[in-house]
């Protein structure tokens, strides 16, 4: 019996951070990536410079159109990903420009490791997306080599590419930082990442740790450790895994000025607020909103209370 080809389109699946998502895999039958991350759930594979198996863009377009035509419920976002790194796909610009006209209000999202943002062709394609999410697990070179095991170890070139792209991109730019215990969770690495992200127009930081079996049996951080790591990202909208949020059992009791100072240092997610604020502090949010001292900023499907 002939083996069926893996599906190009999958879902819809419900994403807490982006809503109901229909996924598109640009490399469904083979892992093709320029990283070999120790947390990757796709298995170990030698990092490559370019895709060895390339699906025709017409095949991808037809698969996406068919999936959209057969949807029984509306979706929030079409997510371009890959069994590896989607920006390695050589026809990415043609693909996104071809599918946007028939998305009918559905947002477009790409999940990337951020390593090729310095390439003009990649930048041109990424500019077409409503949301671009990239990974930045390490800036410290030793940590970068250990956690991401990249094809190219030029972290400065990667950072320069992300910085330049952020200066021309008009959509929502989201960073993902995945921390491995004893590998990239040092204070030095966290300070470097936070300082870099504060330079760019970042909409949100998704901070997480291992939650699924990985290629190298990488150790995860505890809930408390991850919460402590989030404090390095002062002033940025930080999204933690839902399990981490529910671990915050101690309710914060504070006056309105203290709450405003807290939000000024670190935007507070609307999901997190009722879990960590006592009833009086939670009521202060409405007062601060009415007095236009804070505002609600939406990033993907998550909302944050932010100071002006």
UniProtKB/Swiss-Prot annotation:
[4Fe-4S] cluster binds at residues 33, 37, 40. Keywords: 4Fe-4S, Iron, Iron-sulfur, Metal-binding, S-adenosyl-L-methionine. Its cofactor is [4Fe-4S] cluster. Binds 1 [4Fe-4S] cluster. The cluster is coordinated with 3 cysteines and an exchangeable S-adenosyl-L-methionine. SUPFAM superfamilies: Radical SAM enzymes. InterPro entries: Aldolase_TIM (IPR013785), GTPase_Obg (IPR040084), rSAM (IPR007197). It holds the Pfam family Radical_SAM. GO terms for molecular function: 4 iron, 4 sulfur cluster binding; catalytic activity; metal ion binding. Residues 18-248 form the Radical SAM core domain. PROSITE patterns: RADICAL_SAM (PS51918). Belongs to the UPF0026 family. This is UPF0026 protein HP_0117. It comes from Helicobacter pylori (strain ATCC 700392 / 26695) (Campylobacter pylori).
